[in-house]
């Protein structure tokens, strides 16, 4: 600046010159700027003052280089008023705008033409911010830029989903709202999406009322035969060291699958595809996802027990038999073991979980609360494995996204923690899912406790406020040097703020997320202790309601599943099925479905057999939601010889009533 200028001329020139300094060093992807120091009473506008994270522009002959401020310092501060001092800004070079023949610009990530020493630096203008952060790719808006709230923060959908993403932040920083906001923005522009969200706290149903298919233990159908061998061993045995029991299952399950296939195909069992003996285990493996009956498994176990001479060898057989009988009578496992009939409904199960067809419900919210704690990891493992296999065998024609909330539960960093098959299933999606159209979203409050292999595969990260040093270090390791300066903000980020970096956004950026509508918020708000503790509105009646809901929850699950089981075993044509009992072929060579507790006794005389039937009896007390609860009691009743059933006069109305009750619950 010319020293002969008057003070007024200096101020006028400073105010008209958009530059804020000049390049004095360039090293790889970094540069250092010597900032112009306002003197003689001159002051820059607030918008022209560089801050941490501010996007700056550097004009070259053919491009405009874009850089992010990563550090600010005054290495030589003034000792007295009026003395000169040196202001330094450290930059990370992140992209460039190429000048086109039509005087327009094209944004490219990365830098091909580096700034030269002495090049002037200025704060990026609105048009440059729009070119850099909005772009032309298929994008959705999730908020605004911290640097300029008039510029929308855009997320590129294909890059976000195709290469996996993570949402990280301390408890209470808005992870659930951020997850809901991003997914809602995607669904709004992509109504034929296929998203499966694992919801361990039952909080997302309210966030996707118009788009979500809610699956809970009350209406879930995940038959046991969909489990692979590791998963069924976890359910029935639970200890991988019990080798004898594992070997028994490994031998008998393929045979049980063969028995079901033979009975289902009847005369087709002699075709070329099923020419071998039904007891030939080589036709099926323990992992083949085909139906089989627990009754067949129990029969074979009992047969083996009868052939053993040494009573000491009975122990593993008894353990499996006891567990099978116990679990099939446990209402909590009804979604897996409760069906009175076994049928091959795999296509229908896949359709409901992965929304094929979409039917205006592009997201499935699978609520895990209410599942037995010991089986949650198994259910998650099955769903994650099915997600990958669905994508593989669908040849990528229907891309699907798996959202894993509280992911540190399922893919912990410790090799000794977690359920191995579950970790392997999620890792497989993370490593190989991109090639087949299976994407992964990881949501967690403890990045340091996540398997680093999984987190390293997430090419886009939304980092909300974090104060833990270990968590910050994990995030830091995932960021390139050019955006590392932004992470200094992590402990000081406000509500609804995040640092976003990776392939899903054009450049590392600090985002202020949009507000969600009040009726679309997840049920994840923090309890107001101070408000609740100022009034006394809890009494003995309140405790009674808690106890009633606590106890009724299991009964309602049992009732809902039992109604479904009854519907499965009844033909809605006015009469019960008159097909032969399971174990005896009908005229067409098929086996009729029969409750599993009868199948194991099919060889006994009918008049000597007792079975457990569900008989409804209305209890006097109301349920947790205020309506009458019909509890279904198991009672021992004799089984009459099979005979042709004549339709009763009122059978049709009774069955219609049952159908109506089922439809109301669904």
Predicted regions and their residues:
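Conserved ATP-driven motor cores of ASCE-family P-loop NTPases powering translocation/secretion/packaging/pilus
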Residues: 233, 238, 427-432, 436-514
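Conserved P-loop NTPase motor module
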Residues: 496-666
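Loop/turn-to-beta-strand initiation segments
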Residues: 192-195, 361-363, 397-401, 436-441
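Substrate-engagement module of ASCE P-loop NTPases
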Residues: 185-189, 386-392, 423-440, 484
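P-loop NTPase motor domains
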Residues: 202-206, 212, 225-428
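Basic- and hydrophobic-enriched, low-structure N-terminal and domain-boundary segments
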Residues: 1-168, 395-398, 413
């Amino acid at each position: 600046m010319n020293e002969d200028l008057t003070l007024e001329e200096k101020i006028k020139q400073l105010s008209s010159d958009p530059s804020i300094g000049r390049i004095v060093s360039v090293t790889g992807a970094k540069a250092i700027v010597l900032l112009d120091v306002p003197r003689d009473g001159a002051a820059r506008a607030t918008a022209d003052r560089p801050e941490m994270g501010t996007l700056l522009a550097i004009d070259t002959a053919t491009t405009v280089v874009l850089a992010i401020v990563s550090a600010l310092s005054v290495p030589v501060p003034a000792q007295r008023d009026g003395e000169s001092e040196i202001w330094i800004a450290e930059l990370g070079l992140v992209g460039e705008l190429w000048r086109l023949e039509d005087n327009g610009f094209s944004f490219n990530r990365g830098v091909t033409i580096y700034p030269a020493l002495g090049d002037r630096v200025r704060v990026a203008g609105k048009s440059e911010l729009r070119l850099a952060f909005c772009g032309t790719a298929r994008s959705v808006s999730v908020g605004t830029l911290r640097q300029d709230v008039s510029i929308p923060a855009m997320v590129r959908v294909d890059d976000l989903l195709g290469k996996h993403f993570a949402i990280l932040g301390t408890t209470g920083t808005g992870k659930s709202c951020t997850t809901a906001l991003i997914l809602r923005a995607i669904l709004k522009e992509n109504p034929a999406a296929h998203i499966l969200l694992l919801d361990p706290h039952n909080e997302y149903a309210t966030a996707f009322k118009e788009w979500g298919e809610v699956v809970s233990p009350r209406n879930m159908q995940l038959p046991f035969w969909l489990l692979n061998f590791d998963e069924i061993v976890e359910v029935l045995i639970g200890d991988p060291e019990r080798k004898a029991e594992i070997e028994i299952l490994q031998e008998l399950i393929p045979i049980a699958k063969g028995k079901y296939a033979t009975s289902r195909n009847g005369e087709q069992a002699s075709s070329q595809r099923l020419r071998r003996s039904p007891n030939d285990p080589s036709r099926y493996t323990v992992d083949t996802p085909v139906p089989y009956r627990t009754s067949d498994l129990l029969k074979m176990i009992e047969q083996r027990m009868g052939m053993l001479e040494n009573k000491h060898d009975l122990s593993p057989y008894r353990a499996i038999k006891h567990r099978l009988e116990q679990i099939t009578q446990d209402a909590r496992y009804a979604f897996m073991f409760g069906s009175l009939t076994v049928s091959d409904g795999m296509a229908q199960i896949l359709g409901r979980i992965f929304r094929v067809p979409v039917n205006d419900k592009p997201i499935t919210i699978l609520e895990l609360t209410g599942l037995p704690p010991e089986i949650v990891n198994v259910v998650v493992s099955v769903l994650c494995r099915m997600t990958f296999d669905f994508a593989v065998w669908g040849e990528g024609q229907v891309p699907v996204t798996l959202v894993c909330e509280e992911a540190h539960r399922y893919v912990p960093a410790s090799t000794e923690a977690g359920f191995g098959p579950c970790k392997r299933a999620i890792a497989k999606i993370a490593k190989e899912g991109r090639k087949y159209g299976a994407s992964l979203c990881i949501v967690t409050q403890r990045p340091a406790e996540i398997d680093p292999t999984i987190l390293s595969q997430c090419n886009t990260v939304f980092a909300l406020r974090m104060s833990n040093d270990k968590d910050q270090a994990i995030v830091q390791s995932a960021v390139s040097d050019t955006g590392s300066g932004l992470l200094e903000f992590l402990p000081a980020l406000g509500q609804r703020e995040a640092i976003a970096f990776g392939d899903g956004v054009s450049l590392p950026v600090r985002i202020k997320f949009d507000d969600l509508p009040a009726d679309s918020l997840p049920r994840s708000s923090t309890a107001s202790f101070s408000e609740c503790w100022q009034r006394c509105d809890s009494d003995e009646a309140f405790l009674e309601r808690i106890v009633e809901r606590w106890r009724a929850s299991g009964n309602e699950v049992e009732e809902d599943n039992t109604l479904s089981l009854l519907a499965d075993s009844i033909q809605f044509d006015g009469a019960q099925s008159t097909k032969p009992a399971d174990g005896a072929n009908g005229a067409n060579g098929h086996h009729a479905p029969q409750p599993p507790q009868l199948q194991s006794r099919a060889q006994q005389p009918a008049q000597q057999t007792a079975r457990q039937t569900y008989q409804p009896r209305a209890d006097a007390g109301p349920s947790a939601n205020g309506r009458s609860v019909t509890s279904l009691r198991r009672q021992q009743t004799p089984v009459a010889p099979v005979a042709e059933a004549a339709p009763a006069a009122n059978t049709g109305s009774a069955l219609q009533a049952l159908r109506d009750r089922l439809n109301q619950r669904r």
